[in-house]
Amino acid sequence: MKVMIIAPYIYDDNIIEFTKNKTGFGIMVQNIVSSVAELENVVLLTRVITKGKNEKNFKILSHTWGQFFSNAKLKDWLIGIKAFFANGVTVKDKARHVFYEVDGGYVRKQIQKEKPDIVHIHGIGTITESYIRICEEMKVRYTVTLHGLIGLNDSVSAPAYEKQIERDFLIKAEKNNIPISVISSGMKARIEEKYLGKKANNITVITNGTKKSDENDTKFIREEGTLTQEKFQEYYSDCLKQNDLYPKLSDTYAYLQYSKKNGKKILFFVGNITKNKNQMQAVEILKNTKVFENILLVLWGREVDNGEVRKKIAEYQLHKNVILGGFNDRMDIFWKFCDVNLFLSLNDGFGLPIVEGYMHGVPCVTFEDLDATQDLYYPEAMLKVKDRSNESVTDTLKIALDKNWKYEEIIEIGNMFSIDKIGRASCRERVFWVVV
């Protein structure tokens, strides 16, 4: 079966044009593409301008400005012009929406050329609307995967029109039996309750997965004593004074190695730093240094919060307890330092960092009411926080740090969510919809 996977972008550190968007979504889609390509004939189409590339098992289709202009039809331009004059949109967004709609001509041409059995679209919004439009125009079978919900989450920063697109499409999809997959049971339940008011037979839960790298850490190991605790803390204090400046990964690695050796308990919190990911609450909790004197928290991810968390770390003088680590594409060699994976997101479809931690034997503390918790909760690997107060998080975290976790059991749970298993489930779902 030939599958055309369509996504706004992926993250791949080996291809320069795919390194701009350093997000969990980009990593997840790249993992899914690689996994499905082990089983099916896969081509990948994105919004990114690229010359394309033949990867080991799949092909990234070229997407150049020449292809953009030469394949656009009059109707694509007319729809683009209509999008430009939409209400409540900034000029920058207007230009972006015109690009998305006019780019429909390129998408049409690629579908004609590649002749996929099914098109698999990732995400709902203005950035993917023209993908759906072209599939329906050409009467090509398509399925859509949602990696999160924006319309039901006040903490997710998105324009009202984007949230309305999500709502309208999910209602349309249920009415027309368009196959949808979501990444957690909690997401499906909320769609049924808040959008549809009934059970949705067209929605399937296929949890996301991840893969564990065999990468070694040889290049990160340095001679003992070359970066003392005092030197790192002084160096990190200087980093805190400048926006988007982080310690080198090799220096953070050395400091974590030193801290672990000297009895520190280490927490990781993985995800771009945003209001929704809620790293600020973790910082507020660590402010109580009497309780967490021997704790080191590392926040891994890009800052998308205008430096608010950075300012709080400086204000509370927590440079000895909270490290802004920046985006880390070598996480696999860092997990061994982590005692507990802290995940305090306000809303999250799946909680990929939870699974990444599991695969390395790292237990998690997270909120009971997250969409992700229903599928990822195993008492051998997770403690659930009953409510969102700082006191409840503090109490649960203290229990987690004192608990005698069985790391091999946690790894076994993590292996249940390997990207290969998820890829096979995804392929079975596509085959079903193609046959139907």
Placement of each model-derived feature along the sequence:
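N-terminal subdomain of nucleotide-sugar transferases
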Residues: 1-53, 59
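Membrane-proximal helix-turn-helix segments that form the acceptor-binding/catalytic region
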Residues: 31-32, 150, 160-180
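A short, active-site helix/loop in glycosyltransferases that binds the activated sugar's phosphate group
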Residues: 50, 172-244
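Conserved donor-binding/catalytic core segment of Leloir-type glycosyltransferases
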Residues: 181, 222-277, 286
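Glycosyltransferase donor-sugar binding loop
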Residues: 210, 270-274, 295-310
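Nucleotide-activated donor-binding/catalytic signature segment of Leloir-type glycosyltransferases, i.e.
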Residues: 309-328
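Aromatic "clamp/platform" in nucleotide-sugar-dependent glycosyltransferases that forms part
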Residues: 346
